[in-house]
Swiss-Prot record:
PROSITE patterns: SET, ZINC_FINGER_C2H2_1, ZINC_FINGER_C2H2_2. Residues 269-286 have a biased composition (Polar residues). Keywords: DNA-binding, Metal-binding, Methyltransferase, Neurogenesis, Nucleus, Repeat, Repressor, Transcription, Transcription regulation, Transferase, Zinc, Zinc-finger. This is Zinc finger protein 488. It comes from Danio rerio. SUPFAM superfamilies: beta-beta-alpha zinc fingers, SET domain. Expressed in pMN progenitors and oligodendrocyte lineage cells in the embryo with expression declining in oligodendrocytes undergoing differentiation. InterPro entries: PRDM8-like_PR/SET, SET_dom, SET_dom_sf, TR-Histone_Methyltrans, Znf_C2H2_sf, Znf_C2H2_type. Residues 267-303, 338-361 are annotated as: Disordered. The gene is znf488. GO terms for cellular component: nucleus.
Amino acid sequence: MEHSIFPRSLWTNDSKILHHHVADFFSSVQVTQDIPAGTSFGPCVLHNTFYDTIAFIALKSFDKRNKSYVFRVDPEAMKGSPLVVPWLRLVQAAMSEEDQNTEAYLKGGQLHFRTIRDVKEGEELLVWYDEELSHLLGFRDIKAKALTDGYTCTRCGQAFKNENPFLAHCRFLCTQEKVDIIRPINQQKPEVKRHRKVIDFHNIARDLEDKMNTSSFEDTTILRKRKQEPFLTPKSKKTVLLEKTNITNESNTTNANKDCRAFRDLSEPTDNAQTNESKISKNSAFTEVRKAPEPSNPEKSSRDIMAPEVGLQSNCSAFSFVVPKSARSEQKSAFCEPSKRALAEAQNPSPPDTDNSLDSFKSKSSLGYRNVLASHLFPTDLAGSHSGGGMSAPLTSGGSYYYAPEHWTRAIGGQLQSTSSLTLLPPTFTPLGVSVQNWCAKCNLSFRMTSDLVFHMRSHHKKEFAAEAQVRRRREEKLTCPICHEYFRERHHLSRHMTSHN
Protein backbone atom coordinates (compact mmCIF):
# COMPACT_ATOMS: atom_id res chain seq x y z
CA MET A 1 0.00 0.00 0.00
CA GLU A 2 1.10 3.48 -0.68
CA HIS A 3 1.83 6.26 1.75
CA SER A 4 -0.68 8.64 0.14
CA ILE A 5 -3.85 7.18 1.73
CA PHE A 6 -3.11 9.05 4.96
CA PRO A 7 -4.06 12.72 5.27
CA ARG A 8 -1.16 14.99 4.51
CA SER A 9 -1.46 16.72 7.89
CA LEU A 10 -0.67 13.46 9.67
CA TRP A 11 2.69 12.69 8.16
CA THR A 12 4.15 16.01 6.98
CA ASN A 13 4.27 17.67 10.41
CA ASP A 14 7.31 16.97 12.54
CA SER A 15 5.20 16.35 15.66
CA LYS A 16 2.73 14.06 13.88
CA ILE A 17 5.12 11.83 11.96
CA LEU A 18 2.86 8.93 11.10
CA HIS A 19 5.16 7.77 8.32
CA HIS A 20 4.76 4.01 8.13
CA HIS A 21 3.47 1.42 5.79
CA VAL A 22 -0.16 0.53 6.47
CA ALA A 23 0.64 -3.18 6.76
CA ASP A 24 2.74 -2.55 9.85
CA PHE A 25 -0.30 -1.36 11.81
CA PHE A 26 -2.27 -4.58 11.22
CA SER A 27 0.52 -7.12 11.71
CA SER A 28 1.58 -9.17 14.71
CA VAL A 29 4.62 -11.29 15.53
CA GLN A 30 4.30 -14.63 17.34
CA VAL A 31 7.18 -16.85 18.42
CA THR A 32 7.40 -20.54 17.59
CA GLN A 33 9.23 -21.58 20.78
CA ASP A 34 9.61 -20.56 24.39
CA ILE A 35 11.92 -17.61 24.99
CA PRO A 36 13.44 -16.96 28.44
CA ALA A 37 13.55 -13.51 30.03
CA GLY A 38 16.51 -11.34 29.10
CA THR A 39 16.82 -12.55 25.51
CA SER A 40 17.93 -9.72 23.20
CA PHE A 41 17.16 -9.19 19.53
CA GLY A 42 18.59 -6.65 17.15
CA PRO A 43 19.80 -4.26 16.19
CA CYS A 44 16.78 -2.71 14.53
CA VAL A 45 18.53 -0.46 12.04
CA LEU A 46 16.29 2.45 11.02
CA HIS A 47 17.85 3.00 7.61
CA ASN A 48 14.58 3.39 5.70
CA THR A 49 13.24 6.90 5.13
CA PHE A 50 9.92 5.89 6.70
CA TYR A 51 11.65 4.61 9.83
CA ASP A 52 14.11 7.36 10.70
CA THR A 53 13.04 7.73 14.35
CA ILE A 54 12.62 5.49 17.39
CA ALA A 55 9.13 6.92 17.88
CA PHE A 56 7.67 4.40 15.41
CA ILE A 57 6.76 2.13 18.35
CA ALA A 58 4.66 4.83 20.02
CA LEU A 59 2.99 5.75 16.74
CA LYS A 60 1.57 2.23 16.48
CA SER A 61 0.00 2.29 19.96
CA PHE A 62 -3.85 2.25 19.96
CA ASP A 63 -6.58 1.08 22.31
CA LYS A 64 -7.99 -1.20 19.62
CA ARG A 65 -5.80 -3.45 17.50
CA ASN A 66 -6.83 -5.30 14.37
CA LYS A 67 -4.69 -8.29 13.45
CA SER A 68 -4.73 -8.87 9.73
CA TYR A 69 -1.24 -10.34 9.33
CA VAL A 70 0.34 -12.84 11.71
CA PHE A 71 4.04 -13.64 11.37
CA ARG A 72 5.39 -16.70 13.14
CA VAL A 73 9.06 -16.19 13.84
CA ASP A 74 11.76 -18.35 15.41
CA PRO A 75 13.97 -15.76 17.14
CA GLU A 76 16.90 -18.13 17.64
CA ALA A 77 17.03 -18.93 13.93
CA MET A 78 16.61 -15.30 12.94
CA LYS A 79 19.42 -13.91 15.09
CA GLY A 80 22.08 -14.13 12.38
CA SER A 81 19.73 -13.57 9.46
CA PRO A 82 19.61 -10.30 7.49
CA LEU A 83 15.82 -10.40 7.88
CA VAL A 84 16.10 -9.53 11.58
CA VAL A 85 15.63 -5.85 10.73
CA PRO A 86 12.24 -6.22 8.94
CA TRP A 87 10.55 -8.50 11.49
CA LEU A 88 11.52 -6.35 14.48
CA ARG A 89 9.69 -3.43 12.89
CA LEU A 90 6.53 -5.56 12.71
CA VAL A 91 6.31 -6.03 16.50
CA GLN A 92 3.30 -4.13 17.84
CA ALA A 93 3.32 -1.71 20.77
CA ALA A 94 1.98 -2.79 24.15
CA MET A 95 -1.08 -0.96 25.43
CA SER A 96 -0.07 -1.19 29.12
CA GLU A 97 2.55 -2.66 31.41
CA GLU A 98 0.45 -5.81 31.92
CA ASP A 99 0.51 -6.63 28.21
CA GLN A 100 4.18 -5.77 27.69
CA ASN A 101 6.65 -8.62 27.42
CA THR A 102 9.45 -6.91 25.46
CA GLU A 103 11.19 -3.59 25.95
CA ALA A 104 13.15 -1.43 23.51
CA TYR A 105 16.50 -0.04 24.60
CA LEU A 106 19.54 1.64 23.10
CA LYS A 107 22.84 -0.18 22.83
CA GLY A 108 25.78 1.27 20.96
CA GLY A 109 23.58 3.95 19.45
CA GLN A 110 21.18 1.38 17.91
CA LEU A 111 17.76 0.09 18.88
CA HIS A 112 17.51 -3.40 20.41
CA PHE A 113 14.63 -5.46 21.80
CA ARG A 114 14.81 -7.49 25.02
CA THR A 115 12.28 -9.77 26.70
CA ILE A 116 11.38 -8.75 30.26
CA ARG A 117 9.63 -12.04 31.16
CA ASP A 118 9.35 -15.56 29.83
CA VAL A 119 7.49 -15.71 26.52
CA LYS A 120 5.65 -18.92 25.77
CA GLU A 121 5.27 -20.59 22.40
CA GLY A 122 2.63 -18.93 20.21
CA GLU A 123 2.51 -15.77 22.34
CA GLU A 124 2.61 -12.39 20.60
CA LEU A 125 5.51 -10.02 21.21
CA LEU A 126 4.40 -6.61 22.53
CA VAL A 127 7.09 -3.97 23.00
CA TRP A 128 7.41 -0.62 24.78
CA TYR A 129 10.29 1.65 25.76
CA ASP A 130 12.51 1.14 28.78
CA GLU A 131 13.05 3.79 31.48
CA GLU A 132 15.86 5.56 29.63
CA LEU A 133 13.99 5.94 26.35
CA SER A 134 10.78 6.92 28.16
CA HIS A 135 12.67 9.74 29.82
CA LEU A 136 14.26 10.84 26.53
CA LEU A 137 10.90 10.90 24.76
CA GLY A 138 9.25 12.86 27.59
CA PHE A 139 6.81 10.18 28.72
CA ARG A 140 7.67 10.49 32.41
CA ASP A 141 6.37 14.03 32.75
CA ILE A 142 3.16 13.21 30.92
CA LYS A 143 2.69 10.09 33.06
CA ALA A 144 3.02 12.09 36.30
CA LYS A 145 0.27 14.44 35.13
CA ALA A 146 -1.95 11.54 34.07
CA LEU A 147 -2.00 10.11 37.61
CA THR A 148 -4.30 12.96 38.73
CA ASP A 149 -6.35 13.70 35.62
CA GLY A 150 -6.64 10.20 34.19
CA TYR A 151 -6.00 9.22 30.59
CA THR A 152 -7.67 12.28 29.05
CA CYS A 153 -5.86 14.64 26.70
CA THR A 154 -5.89 18.21 28.02
CA ARG A 155 -5.60 19.63 24.51
CA CYS A 156 -8.40 17.92 22.61
CA GLY A 157 -10.28 16.19 25.44
CA GLN A 158 -9.94 12.70 23.94
CA ALA A 159 -10.12 9.90 26.52
CA PHE A 160 -8.11 6.67 26.43
CA LYS A 161 -8.50 3.34 28.17
CA ASN A 162 -4.81 2.45 28.38
CA GLU A 163 -1.69 4.31 29.35
CA ASN A 164 0.61 3.83 26.37
CA PRO A 165 -1.85 5.05 23.69
CA PHE A 166 -2.49 8.10 25.86
CA LEU A 167 1.24 8.87 26.10
CA ALA A 168 1.74 8.41 22.36
CA HIS A 169 -1.23 10.65 21.57
CA CYS A 170 -0.12 13.49 23.87
CA ARG A 171 3.48 13.33 22.70
CA PHE A 172 3.12 12.85 18.94
CA LEU A 173 -0.41 12.57 17.56
CA CYS A 174 -2.49 15.38 19.07
CA THR A 175 -3.48 17.91 16.39
CA GLN A 176 -4.89 20.60 18.69
CA GLU A 177 -3.11 23.70 19.94
CA LYS A 178 -0.14 22.72 22.05
CA VAL A 179 -0.42 23.54 25.78
CA ASP A 180 2.01 22.66 28.51
CA ILE A 181 0.83 19.22 29.66
CA ILE A 182 3.10 19.03 32.65
CA ARG A 183 2.06 22.36 34.22
CA PRO A 184 -1.62 23.16 34.94
CA ILE A 185 -3.35 25.77 32.79
CA ASN A 186 -3.72 28.28 35.62
CA GLN A 187 -0.01 28.03 36.42
CA GLN A 188 1.25 28.47 32.88
CA LYS A 189 3.48 31.42 32.28
CA PRO A 190 2.38 33.94 29.67
CA GLU A 191 4.36 33.99 26.47
CA VAL A 192 6.96 36.72 26.46
CA LYS A 193 7.90 38.09 23.06
CA ARG A 194 11.41 39.40 22.67
CA HIS A 195 11.74 42.79 21.09
CA ARG A 196 14.26 42.90 18.31
CA LYS A 197 17.01 45.45 18.72
CA VAL A 198 16.83 48.21 16.14
CA ILE A 199 19.93 50.30 15.58
CA ASP A 200 19.05 53.83 14.51
CA PHE A 201 22.20 55.32 13.01
CA HIS A 202 20.50 58.46 11.72
CA ASN A 203 19.50 60.01 15.05
CA ILE A 204 22.38 58.91 17.27
CA ALA A 205 24.19 62.24 17.21
CA ARG A 206 21.07 64.39 17.64
CA ASP A 207 19.60 62.36 20.49
CA LEU A 208 22.93 62.12 22.28
CA GLU A 209 23.38 65.90 22.16
CA ASP A 210 19.87 66.59 23.48
CA LYS A 211 20.11 64.03 26.25
CA MET A 212 23.53 65.05 27.48
CA ASN A 213 22.61 68.73 27.53
CA THR A 214 19.59 68.05 29.75
CA SER A 215 21.46 65.68 32.07
CA SER A 216 24.59 67.76 32.57
CA PHE A 217 23.51 68.84 36.05
CA GLU A 218 22.72 65.27 37.05
CA ASP A 219 26.12 64.07 35.85
CA THR A 220 27.84 66.75 37.92
CA THR A 221 26.13 65.66 41.14
CA ILE A 222 26.91 62.02 40.53
CA LEU A 223 30.53 62.86 39.81
CA ARG A 224 30.85 64.71 43.13
CA LYS A 225 29.45 61.75 45.04
CA ARG A 226 31.76 59.28 43.38
CA LYS A 227 34.82 61.38 44.07
CA GLN A 228 34.42 60.50 47.73
CA GLU A 229 34.30 56.75 47.10
CA PRO A 230 37.54 54.73 47.14
CA PHE A 231 38.94 54.02 43.71
CA LEU A 232 39.30 50.53 42.38
CA THR A 233 42.70 48.90 42.24
CA PRO A 234 44.06 47.78 38.87
CA LYS A 235 43.74 44.15 39.97
CA SER A 236 40.00 44.46 40.52
CA LYS A 237 39.40 46.07 37.15
CA LYS A 238 38.64 43.88 34.18
CA THR A 239 39.67 44.76 30.67
CA VAL A 240 36.60 44.04 28.60
CA LEU A 241 35.46 44.98 25.11
CA LEU A 242 32.11 46.76 25.05
CA GLU A 243 29.82 46.89 22.02
CA LYS A 244 27.27 49.65 21.45
CA THR A 245 23.77 48.55 20.49
CA ASN A 246 21.12 51.22 20.10
CA ILE A 247 17.63 49.79 20.64
CA THR A 248 15.61 52.99 20.19
CA ASN A 249 16.31 56.68 20.26
CA GLU A 250 15.24 57.00 23.90
CA SER A 251 17.02 53.87 25.11
CA ASN A 252 20.10 54.84 23.10
CA THR A 253 20.57 58.10 24.94
CA THR A 254 19.74 56.53 28.29
CA ASN A 255 22.33 53.78 27.84
CA ALA A 256 24.89 56.30 26.67
CA ASN A 257 24.50 58.34 29.85
CA LYS A 258 24.68 55.21 31.99
CA ASP A 259 27.89 54.16 30.27
CA CYS A 260 29.40 57.56 30.80
CA ARG A 261 28.59 57.55 34.51
CA ALA A 262 29.90 54.01 34.88
CA PHE A 263 33.23 54.92 33.33
CA ARG A 264 33.73 57.80 35.72
CA ASP A 265 34.77 55.27 38.34
CA LEU A 266 37.94 54.70 36.36
CA SER A 267 38.84 58.37 36.13
CA GLU A 268 40.74 60.38 38.71
CA PRO A 269 39.50 63.65 40.25
CA THR A 270 40.47 66.74 38.32
CA ASP A 271 39.85 70.44 38.70
CA ASN A 272 36.62 72.15 37.60
CA ALA A 273 38.18 73.74 34.56
CA GLN A 274 39.19 70.40 33.08
CA THR A 275 35.77 68.91 33.83
CA ASN A 276 33.91 71.75 32.11
CA GLU A 277 36.19 71.59 29.10
CA SER A 278 35.68 67.83 28.72
CA LYS A 279 31.88 68.24 28.94
CA ILE A 280 31.87 70.84 26.20
CA SER A 281 33.91 68.59 23.95
CA LYS A 282 31.48 65.69 24.46
CA ASN A 283 28.34 67.49 23.31
CA SER A 284 28.47 66.07 19.80
CA ALA A 285 29.01 62.50 18.73
CA PHE A 286 30.97 63.39 15.59
CA THR A 287 33.22 66.20 16.80
CA GLU A 288 36.94 65.75 17.00
CA VAL A 289 38.86 65.84 20.23
CA ARG A 290 40.42 69.26 20.56
CA LYS A 291 44.15 69.61 20.62
CA ALA A 292 45.59 70.37 24.01
CA PRO A 293 47.91 73.37 24.37
CA GLU A 294 51.61 72.91 24.15
CA PRO A 295 53.29 72.03 27.47
CA SER A 296 55.06 74.85 29.21
CA ASN A 297 58.14 72.77 29.87
CA PRO A 298 59.98 72.27 26.54
CA GLU A 299 62.11 69.47 28.00
CA LYS A 300 59.11 67.38 28.91
CA SER A 301 59.41 63.83 27.60
CA SER A 302 57.42 62.50 24.70
CA ARG A 303 55.85 60.00 27.04
CA ASP A 304 54.15 62.80 28.94
CA ILE A 305 52.85 64.13 25.64
CA MET A 306 51.47 60.80 24.50
CA ALA A 307 50.16 59.69 27.90
CA PRO A 308 46.64 61.12 27.57
CA GLU A 309 46.29 59.55 24.14
CA VAL A 310 47.82 56.25 25.21
CA GLY A 311 45.10 56.24 27.86
CA LEU A 312 42.73 56.33 24.88
CA GLN A 313 40.50 59.25 25.77
CA SER A 314 37.39 59.86 23.76
CA ASN A 315 33.82 60.94 24.22
CA CYS A 316 30.89 58.58 24.64
CA SER A 317 30.28 58.16 20.92
CA ALA A 318 31.45 55.19 18.92
CA PHE A 319 32.11 57.42 15.87
CA SER A 320 34.53 59.96 17.35
CA PHE A 321 38.19 60.03 16.37
CA VAL A 322 41.20 60.61 18.57
CA VAL A 323 43.87 63.09 17.48
CA PRO A 324 47.20 61.96 18.91
CA LYS A 325 49.44 64.75 20.13
CA SER A 326 52.47 63.02 18.66
CA ALA A 327 51.04 63.51 15.16
CA ARG A 328 49.41 66.96 15.11
CA SER A 329 49.05 67.34 11.38
CA GLU A 330 46.44 64.69 10.62
CA GLN A 331 43.65 62.78 12.25
CA LYS A 332 44.07 59.11 13.18
CA SER A 333 41.54 56.33 12.99
CA ALA A 334 41.57 52.58 13.41
CA PHE A 335 40.85 52.22 9.67
CA CYS A 336 43.39 54.70 8.25
CA GLU A 337 46.95 54.03 7.25
CA PRO A 338 49.34 56.07 9.42
CA SER A 339 51.83 58.39 7.82
CA LYS A 340 55.51 57.60 7.87
CA ARG A 341 56.29 60.68 9.96
CA ALA A 342 53.76 59.78 12.65
CA LEU A 343 54.94 56.19 12.77
CA ALA A 344 58.56 57.29 13.00
CA GLU A 345 57.75 59.58 15.92
CA ALA A 346 55.88 56.77 17.65
CA GLN A 347 58.70 54.26 17.21
CA ASN A 348 61.58 56.64 18.09
CA PRO A 349 60.52 58.62 21.16
CA SER A 350 62.87 60.70 23.19
CA PRO A 351 64.20 59.42 26.55
CA PRO A 352 61.59 59.84 29.27
CA ASP A 353 61.71 61.77 32.47
CA THR A 354 61.23 59.26 35.28
CA ASP A 355 60.21 61.92 37.79
CA ASN A 356 57.23 63.10 35.77
CA SER A 357 56.23 59.76 34.22
CA LEU A 358 53.63 58.95 36.85
CA ASP A 359 52.09 62.43 36.72
CA SER A 360 51.24 62.03 33.05
CA PHE A 361 48.33 59.70 33.78
CA LYS A 362 46.24 62.25 35.66
CA SER A 363 44.50 63.65 32.61
CA LYS A 364 41.62 61.14 32.37
CA SER A 365 38.55 63.29 32.62
CA SER A 366 37.11 62.40 29.20
CA LEU A 367 34.99 59.26 29.13
CA GLY A 368 34.46 56.51 26.58
CA TYR A 369 34.84 52.89 25.71
CA ARG A 370 38.51 53.22 24.96
CA ASN A 371 39.10 54.43 28.51
CA VAL A 372 38.45 50.89 29.74
CA LEU A 373 41.29 49.62 27.56
CA ALA A 374 43.77 52.20 28.79
CA SER A 375 47.38 51.27 29.24
CA HIS A 376 47.17 51.57 33.02
CA LEU A 377 44.96 48.46 33.05
CA PHE A 378 47.46 46.33 31.14
CA PRO A 379 50.49 44.85 32.89
CA THR A 380 52.58 45.98 29.91
CA ASP A 381 53.33 49.63 29.24
CA LEU A 382 52.46 50.50 25.65
CA ALA A 383 54.81 53.36 25.09
CA GLY A 384 57.70 51.53 26.70
CA SER A 385 57.51 48.67 24.25
CA HIS A 386 58.25 50.80 21.16
CA SER A 387 61.88 51.38 22.00
CA GLY A 388 62.67 47.85 23.14
CA GLY A 389 63.03 48.71 26.82
CA GLY A 390 64.56 52.13 26.36
CA MET A 391 61.60 53.78 28.03
CA SER A 392 60.63 53.05 31.59
CA ALA A 393 57.50 51.03 32.31
CA PRO A 394 56.41 51.84 35.87
CA LEU A 395 53.16 49.89 35.57
CA THR A 396 54.73 46.63 34.41
CA SER A 397 54.48 43.88 36.99
CA GLY A 398 57.43 41.56 37.03
CA GLY A 399 58.47 42.44 33.48
CA SER A 400 56.21 39.76 32.02
CA TYR A 401 53.95 40.22 29.01
CA TYR A 402 50.46 38.82 28.63
CA TYR A 403 50.68 38.71 24.85
CA ALA A 404 53.81 36.94 23.75
CA PRO A 405 55.21 37.80 20.28
CA GLU A 406 55.18 34.19 19.08
CA HIS A 407 51.42 34.00 19.63
CA TRP A 408 50.75 36.81 17.14
CA THR A 409 53.43 36.54 14.48
CA ARG A 410 55.11 33.73 12.61
CA ALA A 411 58.65 34.49 11.59
CA ILE A 412 59.23 33.09 8.11
CA GLY A 413 62.25 34.47 6.35
CA GLY A 414 63.17 37.76 8.01
CA GLN A 415 63.14 38.23 11.79
CA LEU A 416 60.52 40.65 13.16
CA GLN A 417 60.98 42.95 16.12
CA SER A 418 59.92 41.04 19.22
CA THR A 419 59.57 44.16 21.36
CA SER A 420 57.25 46.07 19.05
CA SER A 421 53.93 47.04 20.56
CA LEU A 422 52.16 45.66 17.51
CA THR A 423 53.17 42.13 18.54
CA LEU A 424 52.25 42.64 22.19
CA LEU A 425 48.66 43.72 21.65
CA PRO A 426 45.54 41.85 20.54
CA PRO A 427 44.11 42.70 17.10
CA THR A 428 41.32 44.80 18.63
CA PHE A 429 43.67 47.33 20.20
CA THR A 430 45.06 50.12 18.00
CA PRO A 431 47.77 52.24 19.65
CA LEU A 432 48.52 55.61 18.03
CA GLY A 433 46.03 54.96 15.23
CA VAL A 434 48.02 52.07 13.72
CA SER A 435 45.61 49.58 12.18
CA VAL A 436 46.49 46.22 13.75
CA GLN A 437 43.57 44.45 12.11
CA ASN A 438 44.83 45.25 8.61
CA TRP A 439 48.51 44.77 9.42
CA CYS A 440 50.82 42.34 7.65
CA ALA A 441 53.07 40.64 10.19
CA LYS A 442 55.62 39.60 7.56
CA CYS A 443 56.26 42.98 5.98
CA ASN A 444 55.31 45.19 8.97
CA LEU A 445 52.92 47.14 6.73
CA SER A 446 49.47 48.51 7.55
CA PHE A 447 46.62 48.77 5.05
CA ARG A 448 43.56 50.97 5.07
CA MET A 449 41.15 48.36 3.72
CA THR A 450 40.92 44.68 4.57
CA SER A 451 40.62 43.86 0.88
CA ASP A 452 44.01 45.52 0.30
CA LEU A 453 45.56 43.29 2.96
CA VAL A 454 43.99 40.20 1.39
CA PHE A 455 45.29 41.16 -2.04
CA HIS A 456 48.74 41.80 -0.55
CA MET A 457 48.85 38.41 1.18
CA ARG A 458 47.75 36.57 -1.95
CA SER A 459 50.17 38.34 -4.25
CA HIS A 460 53.28 38.47 -2.02
CA HIS A 461 53.15 35.60 0.44
CA LYS A 462 51.09 32.86 -1.17
CA LYS A 463 54.01 31.28 -3.03
CA GLU A 464 56.21 31.44 0.02
CA PHE A 465 53.70 29.58 2.18
CA ALA A 466 53.07 27.03 -0.59
CA ALA A 467 56.78 26.39 -1.08
CA GLU A 468 57.36 25.98 2.63
CA ALA A 469 54.44 23.57 3.00
CA GLN A 470 55.70 21.53 0.05
CA VAL A 471 59.19 21.28 1.52
CA ARG A 472 57.82 20.30 4.92
CA ARG A 473 55.57 17.67 3.35
CA ARG A 474 58.48 16.12 1.43
CA ARG A 475 60.61 16.01 4.56
CA GLU A 476 57.84 14.34 6.55
CA GLU A 477 57.37 11.73 3.84
CA LYS A 478 61.08 10.90 3.89
CA LEU A 479 61.18 10.65 7.71
CA THR A 480 57.98 8.61 8.13
CA CYS A 481 57.98 4.87 8.69
CA PRO A 482 56.19 3.18 5.75
CA ILE A 483 54.96 0.37 8.01
CA CYS A 484 53.58 2.04 11.16
CA HIS A 485 53.55 5.62 9.78
CA GLU A 486 55.51 7.03 12.71
CA TYR A 487 57.34 10.32 12.13
CA PHE A 488 60.94 10.98 13.22
CA ARG A 489 62.97 14.16 13.29
CA GLU A 490 66.26 12.67 12.17
CA ARG A 491 67.00 10.10 9.49
CA HIS A 492 69.17 7.92 11.70
CA HIS A 493 66.26 7.66 14.14
CA LEU A 494 64.16 6.23 11.33
CA SER A 495 66.94 3.82 10.38
CA ARG A 496 67.22 2.57 13.95
CA HIS A 497 63.43 2.24 14.13
CA MET A 498 63.29 0.14 10.95
CA THR A 499 65.40 -2.53 12.63
CA SER A 500 62.48 -3.24 14.99
CA HIS A 501 60.31 -4.28 12.05
CA ASN A 502 62.93 -6.73 10.81
